[in-house]
C-alpha cells in the first residue's frame, strides 16, 4: 500500500498557512537565539542587529554608515553589536588591540566584508585583502619599494606634470570668471597622476567616467554583499558563494573593471618597464620574496592598489578643499602661507610643502574628521580574546570605528568642528592642550596600515600648493551642500560636490 502524505488532502490555503506557521516559528527561534543564547548576547546594540544583518544593510542602503554607527556608539557606549556576529568598538584601547599587532594571528582579514567584496569582484587576493600574514608580509616588502622616500622623490616630476596639464582648464575658467565642481576637477587630476604612477604610463587616462559608473554600481550592491557575508557564516551555506560569484560576475562590475586596464595592455606595459619604481614594477618584484603571482593575482594587485589609493586620496582632496573654503580664516591663512613661502611656482616642491605647518594642519584635520580607512574596510576576524575589557568569542567580526574615535570629546576638544590650529604648537592655556593625538590614526596602524599614505599626502600637498599659489576660489551656496548631511558613506564616500568660482590670485599672470 503506497504511503500518502496527509498534506495531500490539505487545501492550498491550508498548506500555505502551515508554511507561514513554520516560517514564523523559525523566525522566533532565530530571534530568541540571537537575543538570549548567542555568545554575543551580553553586548548591547539595536534589536535588528542581534539576529540579522538588517541594521547594517539599511545603513549601507541609506549611505549613512559612518554617522549612524557614531549615533549607536553615542547611545550604547564604546562597544556595540551591529550584527549577529559583529562588534564595533570606539576606544583607543580597542583600536590598538585590534590593529597594532597584525602578525600574531589573533586578528585576520579572512571572512571580512572587504575581503568578500574583493573576492567577488576580483579573481585573486590583493595586498589589501590577503588573509595569510606570511604572504602579506612578503608582498608588502616588495610593493613597499614603490613608496620609499627615494621613489617618492622620483615620482614628483610626474605628479607636477599632470597638475600643470590639469590647470589649463582652471586657467580658462579664471579668465572668464567661470564656476566648476572643484571636487570633480581634483579627482580627475589625481586619477591621471595615480594611473601614471601605477603603471609607468597614463594607462587609465580618460577612463575615470567608467570608474565612476562602477562606483555607483558598487554602491547599490553593498547591502547585497552584506547579506551574503551574513549567510556565509551559517552552517552549510558556503556552497552559495560559488553561485553568488556567478551572479555578481554576470553584473557589469567585473567586466567594466577590466576595461579600465585590459589585461593585455597590462602585460604590454609590464614588458616595457624601464626601472621606474611604480606599483607595477614593485609587484613584478614579488619573485624576489619567493612569491609567484599568476595573471589574476598580478591584475588584482595592480588594480586593487590603484583604485584604493585613488578613491581615498581623491576624497581627502575634495574634503580638504571643502573645509578650508567653508572657513574663510583658514582659507586666507593657508593661502598666505603658500604665497609668502614661494616666489614662483617652480619653487614649489613636496619637501618644502611638507614643512608648511598650517597647510599640513588642514590636511590632518580633514583626515581626523573623515578618515578614509573607516567603515567596513577596517574589519578583522578575531580569535577568542578580550578587547577593551570585553570578552570576544572566536570568529567574531570586530572593528574600531575611526570616525567615532577621532570625533570623540574623550580625545579631542571641539571634536566635530574643523579646527586645524589644534595641530600647531599650542600654548599651555589652549583648549587643545589636552587633545590625545595618539587617537589620530586615519591610515590605521600596524602592518596593515595604508602602504601609500606618504605618496597620497605628497600628492595632496603638491596639488594644493600649486592651485592655491596661482588661483583664488570662492565656494558657491555653502548651504547647498553640507558634507555630513549630504555625502554618502559606506565602504567609501560618494555623492559630494564643491562648486566654486575660480579667479586668478592677486599678482598672478
UniProtKB/Swiss-Prot annotation:
<comment type="similarity">
    <text>Belongs to the cytochrome P450 family.</text>
</comment>
<dbReference type="InterPro" id="IPR002401">
    <property type="entry name" value="Cyt_P450_E_grp-I"/>
</dbReference>
<keyword id="KW-0560">Oxidoreductase</keyword>
<dbReference type="GO" id="GO:0005506">
    <property type="term" value="F:iron ion binding"/>
</dbReference>
<dbReference type="InterPro" id="IPR001128">
    <property type="entry name" value="Cyt_P450"/>
</dbReference>
<feature type="transmembrane region" description="Helical">
    <location>
        <begin position="16"/>
        <end position="36"/>
    </location>
</feature>
<dbReference type="GO" id="GO:0016705">
    <property type="term" value="F:oxidoreductase activity, acting on paired donors, with incorporation or reduction of molecular oxygen"/>
</dbReference>
<dbReference type="InterPro" id="IPR036396">
    <property type="entry name" value="Cyt_P450_sf"/>
</dbReference>
<protein>
    <recommendedName>
        <fullName>Cytochrome P450 monooxygenase FUP2</fullName>
        <ecNumber>1.-.-.-</ecNumber>
    </recommendedName>
</protein>
<feature type="transmembrane region" description="Helical">
    <location>
        <begin position="224"/>
        <end position="244"/>
    </location>
</feature>
<dbReference type="GO" id="GO:0020037">
    <property type="term" value="F:heme binding"/>
</dbReference>
<dbReference type="GO" id="GO:0004497">
    <property type="term" value="F:monooxygenase activity"/>
</dbReference>
<keyword id="KW-0479">Metal-binding</keyword>
<keyword id="KW-0812">Transmembrane</keyword>
<keyword id="KW-0503">Monooxygenase</keyword>
<dbReference type="GO" id="GO:0016020">
    <property type="term" value="C:membrane"/>
</dbReference>
<keyword id="KW-0408">Iron</keyword>
<dbReference type="InterPro" id="IPR050121">
    <property type="entry name" value="Cytochrome_P450_monoxygenase"/>
</dbReference>
<keyword id="KW-0472">Membrane</keyword>
<dbReference type="Pfam" id="PF00067">
    <property type="entry name" value="p450"/>
</dbReference>
<feature type="binding site" description="axial binding residue">
    <location>
        <position position="450"/>
    </location>
    <ligand>
        <name>heme</name>
    </ligand>
</feature>
<keyword id="KW-0349">Heme</keyword>
<comment type="pathway">
    <text>Secondary metabolite biosynthesis.</text>
</comment>
<keyword id="KW-1133">Transmembrane helix</keyword>
<comment type="function">
    <text>Cytochrome P450 monooxygenase; part of the gene cluster that mediates the biosynthesis of the mycotoxin fusaproliferin (FUP) that belongs to the class of bicyclic sesterterpenoids.</text>
</comment>
Amino acid at each position: 500500500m503506497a504511503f500518502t502524505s496527509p498534506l495531500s488532502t490539505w487545501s492550498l490555503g491550508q498548506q500555505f498557512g502551515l508554511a507561514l506557521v513554520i516560517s514564523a516559528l523559525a523566525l522566533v527561534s532565530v530571534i530568541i537565539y540571537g537575543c538570549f543564547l548567542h555568545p554575543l548576547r551580553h553586548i548591547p546594540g539595536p534589536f535588528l542587529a542581534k539576529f540579522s544583518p538588517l541594521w547594517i544593510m539599511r545603513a549601507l542602503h541609506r549611505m549613512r554608515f559612518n554617522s549612524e554607527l557614531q549615533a549607536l556608539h553615542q547611545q550604547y557606549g564604546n562597544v556595540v553589536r551591529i550584527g549577529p556576529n559583529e562588534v564595533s568598538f570606539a576606544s583607543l584601547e580597542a583600536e590598538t588591540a585590534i590593529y597594532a599587532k597584525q602578525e600574531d594571528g589573533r586578528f585576520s582579514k579572512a571572512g571580512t566584508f572587504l575581503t568578500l567584496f574583493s573576492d567577488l569582484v576580483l579573481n585573486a587576493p590583493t595586498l589589501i585583502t590577503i588573509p595569510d600574514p606570511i604572504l602579506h608580509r612578503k608582498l608588502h616588502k616588495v610593493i613597499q619599494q614603490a613608496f620609499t622616500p627615494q621613489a617618492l622623490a622620483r615620482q614628483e616630476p610626474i605628479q607636477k606634470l599632470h597638475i600643470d596639464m590639469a590647470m589649463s582648464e582652471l586657467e580658462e575658467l579664471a579668465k572668464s570668471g567661470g564656476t566648476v565642481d572643484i571636487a570633480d576637477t581634483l579627482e580627475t587630476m589625481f586619477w591621471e597622476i595615480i594611473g601614471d604612477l601605477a603603471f609607468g604610463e597614463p594607462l587609465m587616462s580618460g577612463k575615470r567616467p567608467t570608474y565612476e559608473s562602477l562606483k555607483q554600481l558598487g554602491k547599490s550592491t553593498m547591502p547585497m554583499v552584506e547579506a551574503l557575508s551574513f549567510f556565509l557564516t551559517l552552517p552549510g551555506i558556503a556552497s552559495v558563494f560559488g553561485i553568488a560569484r556567478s551572479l555578481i560576475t554576470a553584473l557589469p562590475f567585473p567586466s567594466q573593471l577590466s576595461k579600465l586596464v585590459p589585461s593585455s595592455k597590462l602585460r604590454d606595459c609590464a614588458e616595457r618597464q624601464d626601472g621606474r619604481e611604480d606599483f607595477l614594477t614593485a609587484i613584478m618584484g614579488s619573485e624576489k620574496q619567493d612569491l609567484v603571482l599568476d595573471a589574476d593575482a598580478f591584475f588584482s594587485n595592480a588594480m586593487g592598489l590603484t583604485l584604493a589609493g585613488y578613491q581615498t586620496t581623491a576624497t581627502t582632496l575634495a574634503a580638504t578643499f571643502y573645509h578650508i573654503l567653508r572657513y574663510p580664516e583658514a582659507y586666507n591663512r593657508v593661502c598666505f602661507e603658500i604665497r609668502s613661502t614661494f616666489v614662483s611656482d617652480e619653487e614649489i616642491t613636496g619637501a618644502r610643502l611638507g614643512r608648511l605647518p598650517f597647510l599640513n594642519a588642514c590636511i590632518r584635520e580633514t583626515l581626523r574628521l573623515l578618515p578614509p580607512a573607516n567603515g567596513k574596510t577596517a574589519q578583522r576576524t578575531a580569535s577568542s580574546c578580550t578587547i577593551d575589557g570585553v570578552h570576544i568569542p572566536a570568529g567574531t567580526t570586530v572593528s574600531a570605528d575611526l570616525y567615532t574615535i577621532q570625533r570623540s570629546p574623550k580625545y579631542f576638544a571641539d571634536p566635530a568642528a574643523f579646527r586645524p590650529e589644534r595641530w600647531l604648537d599650542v600654548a599651555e592655556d589652549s583648549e587643545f592642550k589636552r587633545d590625545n593625538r595618539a587617537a589620530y590614526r586615519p591610515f590605521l596602524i600596524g602592518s596593515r596600515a595604508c602602504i601609500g599614505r606618504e605618496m597620497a599626502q605628497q600628492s595632496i600637498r603638491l596639488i594644493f600648493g600649486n592651485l592655491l599659489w596661482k588661483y583664488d576660489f570662492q565656494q558657491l551656496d555653502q548651504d547647498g551642500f553640507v558634507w555630513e548631511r549630504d555625502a554618502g558613506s559606506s565602504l567609501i564616500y560618494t555623492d559630494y560636490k564643491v562648486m566654486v568660482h575660480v579667479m586668478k590670485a592677486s599678482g598672478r599672470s
